[in-house]
Amino acid sequence: MKRLKLLGGVMLFAIVSLMVCGCMVVFPKKYPDVLYKEYDVIKIENRTINGVKTAIVYQVKTEIGARSSPYSLDADSKKDIGAITYYVFKNTDVDEVQIICYYAGGGGLQPYYKFKIKRRDAELSGLLNVSEKELPSATLYYIDKLISLGDLWINDRLPVNG
């Protein structure tokens, strides 16, 4: 009976320790759940477009942060582009990622941005060479190169201050 209590105590301690430390080694973020939970993704479609295996990721934002001009993205959207691109290419065999983001503010659904990048260009940016643990800081470092290697369209009719 004492062994059973001791074993139960050790197991309880291990479970509580894992929950407190949030250990990503034991419980890594799962694709595609991480996109749905953390990046406002509502749908992912895998299609072949003109012979190219493509993942189309649909995202809906209820808030847009401050932007420097109508032709720029807010900081969170830049992070989202980096993270979504990273997770899709790291977890699938698609050749291209397209992100279509809508803004659900002002009483309707309006396009905010569309981003498209090929796997080779994402690899050239350097973002796909980092670990998942390094992703938040690496996104800030690599995002400008990633965006410059892809195709980005921004709806310049949305308000600059959200």
UniProtKB/Swiss-Prot annotation:
Bilayer topology term: Single-pass membrane protein
Gene Ontology cellular-component terms listed: membrane
Recorded superkingdom: Archaea
Transmembrane parts of this sequence: 7-27
Protein localization: Membrane
Chief location: membrane
Record's protein name: Uncharacterized protein MJ0415
